[in-house]
């Protein structure tokens, strides 16, 4: 990712699991004597709104008519909340899911393929019966053609709408001879969080799938987020650009395509360092950011967060330090509502060899898993 601005018919599973598609209002005249003051007021209001919206709207958010369709639901009862939190397993998150990801996994490398297969196998092993698809493709890069592959897991592909959680699993390429870069925060921890959430809520998700809930959970593990040479529109976001374009072409009921089925796109990036701060980047999804903030407060009051001395430490009010180019951009440009959970300012270890397991802060990782688990349970009505 790169920081900028002021401061990133239905789907069918092929034999090999590769993604492929199935075959003006009336106006009333006003008295002339009242028209001039009204026009003046409108002009002043319009100018103010133009200035405000240009400042307040984040990177390339499109003012499309499609709005979030799920109303805010009630908070989980305390007993249910405690059960959800209790189903998370910090040792499983760390040992089973995170450590296998802490390898060099640049696009096209053996480590990248190893991690991709690990993600696919883990998702297929869950009781809920996820619909797991691969999106392999070859793209032109400054280094020549490179093979990439996204992993897409949808709990119920027949559901009308999707709550989509996404992260990238590739690691940044450094020159030969450099210290190996494993990208613990960038983005091994986000990938491990998604796997742990799916495992911890496995039974609840199975039940939701059996009941044909109208909104289902979808997980995207994206390849090629990092630039291979120098960040630019053609050298970055390879996986998200390819997948967003593909999803835009695949029909989905009630339609018209799978991109429209995404009700909320939550992107996780740069997580795992101590004392992260998150800001709402887009007015369109601020209600969901506030929900995360409320969950953080509630878990703190219930003494369910570790190394968390203040009621709110993570989800901060106010404006972010600047816009960030990241894997949400291709989806945002297609009108998808985005909630970007990225630590800003970036962790001190960002894009350095120090972005390792040793510099992660386990209490923060586990706190985030608890906040996200409660958010999913409330959003999906689990």
Curated annotation (Swiss-Prot):
Please give the catalytic activity noted in the UniProt record. Answer: N-terminal L-glutaminyl-[peptide] = N-terminal 5-oxo-L-prolyl-[peptide] + NH4(+)
Q: Protein name, please?
A: Glutaminyl-peptide cyclotransferase-like protein
Q: Name its cellular compartments.
A: Golgi apparatus membrane
Any one Gene Ontology molecular-function term assigned to this protein's record: glutaminyl-peptide cyclotransferase activity
An example GO CC term for this entry is: Golgi membrane
* Function description: Responsible for the biosynthesis of pyroglutamyl peptides.
Q: Which residues form the active site?
A: 225 (proton acceptor), 269 (proton acceptor)
UniProt entry keywords in alphabetical sequence: Acyltransferase, Disulfide bond, Golgi apparatus, Membrane, Metal-binding, Transferase, Transmembrane, Transmembrane helix, Zinc
Q: Extract the CDD domains matched here.
A: M28_QC_like
Cited Gene3D superfamilies: Zn peptidases
Which cysteines pair up through disulfides? They are 167-191
UniProt keyword annotation of Zinc present:
yes
**Bilayer topology annotation:** Single-pass type I membrane protein
Q: Tell me the Pfam families matching this sequence.
A: Peptidase_M28
Kindly list the residue ranges recorded as spanning the membrane: 35-55
Annotated binding of Zn(2+), by residue: 186, 226, 351
Q: What's the Enzyme Commission number for this chain?
A: 2.3.2.5
InterPro entries tied to this protein = M28_QC, Peptidase_M28, QC/QCL
**Which family does the entry's similarity section mention?**
Belongs to the glutaminyl-peptide cyclotransferase family.
Q: Lineage of the native species?
A: Eukaryota, Metazoa, Chordata, Craniata, Vertebrata
Single Gene Ontology BP term? peptidyl-pyroglutamic acid biosynthetic process, using glutaminyl-peptide cyclotransferase
